[in-house]
Amino acid sequence: PGPCNCIETNVCICGTGCSGKCCRCGDACKCASGCGCSGCKVVCKCSGTCKCGCDCTGPTNCKCESGCSCK
């Protein structure tokens, strides 16, 4: 599986103006942090306002911002 697995449509489209930095929703989608990807749900969930890191591949290998926890 790709980073932050795309589990909905397997089709990921980055929002307008988003750069291709870090995989956010899966192999086909490379969106910058904070950018929306239509048709995707991120499997890895970080607590509060924390964001899932670039190396996230799911709940068992979840990497969040420093000081944040994952579920």
From Swiss-Prot:
What induces or represses expression of this protein, per its UniProt record? By cadmium.
Q: Where does Cd(2+) 5 bind?
A: 46, 50, 52, 56
**Annotated InterPro entries:** Metalthion_mollusc
Keyword annotations: Cadmium, Metal-binding, Metal-thiolate cluster
Respond yes or no to whether keyword DNA repair is given for this record. no
Binding residues annotated for Cd(2+) 6, in chain numbering = 52, 64, 68, 70
Q: Which GO terms describe its molecular function?
A: metal ion binding
Question: Which amino acids does the record list as binding Cd(2+) 4?
Answer: 44, 56, 62, 70
Tell me the domain of life: Eukaryota
Residues reported in the UniProt entry to bind Cd(2+) 1: 14, 18, 31, 35
Q: Which residues bind Cd(2+) 2?
A: 18, 23, 37, 40
Asked if the Swiss-Prot or TrEMBL record annotates the protein with the keyword Cell membrane, the reply is no
Q: Which family does it belong to?
A: Belongs to the metallothionein superfamily. Type 2 family.
Q: How does it assemble?
A: Homodimer.
Query: Any idea what job this protein has?
Result: The metallothioneins are involved in the cellular sequestration of toxic metal ions.
- What is the protein named? Metallothionein 20-I isoforms A and B
